[in-house]
Amino acid sequence: MSEALKAFEDELQSKNFKGYWQNVQGDTYREPVPSFGPCHWKGKDLFAAMEKAGDVVGLDVSFRRVIQLWNPSLKNGTSRTLVLNLQLLKPGEDALSHRHMAGAIRFILKGHGTRLIVEGESFETGAGDFVTTPSWTWHDHENRGEKMMWLDGLDAPLVRLLETDFHEPDPRRKQTVTKPEGYTLATAGALRPAWAKTNSIQPPAFCYKWADTERALSKVGEQPGDPYDGIVLDYANPINGGPTLPTMACQIHMLRAGEKTKSHRHTSSTIYHVWRGSGVSYVGDQRYEWEQGDSFVVPLWSFHRHENTAKDPAIFFVMNDKPLMDAIGHYREDAKA
């Protein structure tokens, strides 16, 4: 670099300017290079840590007893836009009401008897049930049954990036249930009141029961499925059939016994949790052997494929940021030759 150019760049910097030629990448790049890598979390380690948290972390210390699946490539989060957590609520405990700009989902892993209350509607939950908590909805949890563990998925990293992270504790501390059981199913399902007004952006809070999911899997399990992901079920917005939340799509993937998928990549980042089964996944140059309870993340534009090495079906709970990529016209997919 010439002394004249160096002096000019210093002059630009002093006035809060920067030359395009100072961009290290410039015009040399041709495709996305993710800023974070893949990562694999072992379920046995996560659940052991959560059991210990249940002994030493009270709800007087932490508003929620939560352990984050932290990607060491990032300052925070599981991917650049999403975070997956594990939460524990012990019998007799109440997690107090609050609301936040981040949209959230809950996938129940263990136990029965916890009520997830969202916007005045109570959802009784058990293992395999899936509940949405859309952005800026009041929500609290009550456990009147067994010890419960569930996955929390949030778009909090995206909200922090956008710097729109509003958060509000509920002065009531706990919500009063104001809606009858099955209210949302009756007002936002295939049949709904003609006068009901719906939010065109945010879906209602909704509970997808595992019995219904399992029944659907049994009906479509003999279909060819997707060559890259196996059998895929979308947790669809009950109002318009769109993605689960505006920024997040959640799915169930099933790999039949011995099934091997083809390799592909896409501009959405994807988080997998092994709900059932065992197998192996290849993410870029990484090989992950997984079993029930494990989780792993596939960064955007990373080739990946899966193999079910067992004699029984393997089932993933999956969340991704494809709706965000679709909304801004950035979604692309590429199959490996």
Task: Describe the function of each predicted region.
Residues R65-L74, L82-R99, V232-I239, Q251-R265:
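Conserved short histidine dyad/triad with adjacent acidic residue
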Residues M1-K42, I239-P246, C250, M254-A257, ...:
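C-terminal functional regions that serve as terminal interaction/effector modules
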Residues V118, E124-G145, W150, D155, ...:
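Conserved metal-binding segment of the jelly-roll/cupin
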Residues M1-R80, P169-D170, Q175-T247, R332:
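A short, N-terminal "cap"/entry segment at the start of jelly-roll beta-barrel domains
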